[in-house]
């Protein structure tokens, strides 16, 4: 089992899944010949903080990014969040990449943002804790802090997008 923990101290509410369990059997593990997710990139967030406000429009100007949260929404409907994480996970399972930017950089501050896309074969584009490599395989996601600037980061994303073999190698990590 993989356990989603309510990171937000949301009081108990029968309409929300505070601890959303994902059965190990339901986690997706990529195979080289597996069909890859249908759409390019998703972004789901509500907090207008951090680097996300700058980066998402830059990537979107190069290739369409579906923004399903309340922040920068361009889908016409908002994905539930803050406890209803199963809807977010289902949504991002349709995308090859997910922008997984934390609200801020903090030592050891790693939230569900990197784990959700990994659980549904979507490569996280992560910005956040400098300790993320201690908990996750650094080859399994794109760490935005490893790039000189956003243009270099976007070039890497678009390279993976156009090269199926490279994309599948990263996804298989």
Regions found by a protein language model. Give the residues of each.
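Residues that scaffold, gate, or flank divalent-cation-dependent active/transport sites
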Residues: 68
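Pol beta-like nucleotidyltransferase catalytic core
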Residues: 1-64, 73-100, 107-173
């Amino acid at each position: 089992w993989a356990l989603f923990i309510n990171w937000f101290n949301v009081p108990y509410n029968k309409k929300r899944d505070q601890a959303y369990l994902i059965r190990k059997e339901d986690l997706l593990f990529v195979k080289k010949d597996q069909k890859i997710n249908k759409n390019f990139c998703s972004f789901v967030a509500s907090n207008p903080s951090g680097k996300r406000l700058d980066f998402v429009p830059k990537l979107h100007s190069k290739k369409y990014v579906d923004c399903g949260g309340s922040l920068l929404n361009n889908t016409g409907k908002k994905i539930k969040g803050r406890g209803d994480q199963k809807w977010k996970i289902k949504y991002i399972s349709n995308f090859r990449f997910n922008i997984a930017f934390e609200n801020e950089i903090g030592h050891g501050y790693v939230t569900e943002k990197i784990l959700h896309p990994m659980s549904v074969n979507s490569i996280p584009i992560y910005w956040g804790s400098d300790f993320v490599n201690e908990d996750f395989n650094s080859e399994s996601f794109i760490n935005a802090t490893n790039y000189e600037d956003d243009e270099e980061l976007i070039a890497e994303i678009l390279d993976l997008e156009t090269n199926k073999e490279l994309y599948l190698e990263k996804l298989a990590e």
